[in-house]
Amino acid sequence: MMSRTPERDLTMKTSSILSLLCSAAAAALVAVSAASAAAAPEPYIPVISKGFQHQFWQAVKLGAEKAAVDFKVKITFEGPENESQVDKQLEMVQAALAKKPQALCLAALDSKAVVPLLRKAQASKIPVVGFDSGVDSDIPVATAATDNVAAAAFAADKLAQLIGGAGEVAAIIHDQTSRTGIDRGDGFVKQMKSKHPNVKVVDVQYGGGDQLKSTDLAKAIIQAHPNLKGFFGANEGSIIGVLNAVKELKKEGKIVVIGYDAGKQQKDAIRKGVEAGAVSQDPVGIGYKCVEAAAKAIKGEPVPKTIDTGFKWYDKANIDSAEMKPLLYD
């Protein structure tokens, strides 16, 4: 048996102390790491829409906020006062990028004008996700939107059917600069020309999504074309303008009206039979899917380039159905 010496006792004590110190240091490191992880800020994603005035955008906002909770990210949601303020939206994008976000969600008012700012985002390795309206660039890693060409073509088919396959029709489109405006206008007009040769599109005007301007434009069209049989409004503001014009000129029941999106005034008109029906998007789904794609892109996870959020036709027969209820906002 080895005899104990003062030197050996000292060595053993020193070893024990060092072992305890190492264990304490390791535990402290784990605790600090855990605290740091808990205190790490959530990734920030600014969500910039085309506007704030329509209930459509409020529904998109609800979806975006739900995704922010589910995917543990922080979002802000903003848009210009109306959908004609392209410069205002560009300022918002510039200000958002200056905050160095981890990603950006954008519904572009002008599919071309925003591209230089998106190049800056790309250079800063900030993934961009489009929603509702795409851009003329492959910079966005994904775009969550309705297939607006197909949806507007479907609206053209419905209108042609409801007027008996022949006659004069017109349309109010929200703009000719955003991807949604271009696609809905083209989808409607081209489908009517190619599939319904006996239906003539006599006028297409652009109201900026503004109800008052759209009302004035629709009234002018109706007065210029007394034989008008059908009218298409391509978004919430546009169709409300058409409904106002039809009412003011006492043409309710004489002109077949078809719309896009939802909102209380449009839903009431459909229930009363003043409006034949409308194409509904899934605004909550659009908001959710764009933030989901952005959150995944931040982590480097793959996301589909195009996220088709779908559309449905609704009229008096199915407006209160369980299938339509989640898609129709007030």
Located regions from the model:
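Long, low-complexity, tandem-repeat intrinsically disordered regions
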Residues: 1, 25-27, 274
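Bacterial N-terminal signal peptides
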Residues: 22-33
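A residue-level marker of the well-folded mature domains of exported/periplasmic proteins
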Residues: 4, 8-9, 13-16, 37-330
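Short hydrophobic transmembrane-like helices used for membrane targeting/insertion
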Residues: 1-2, 17, 30-32
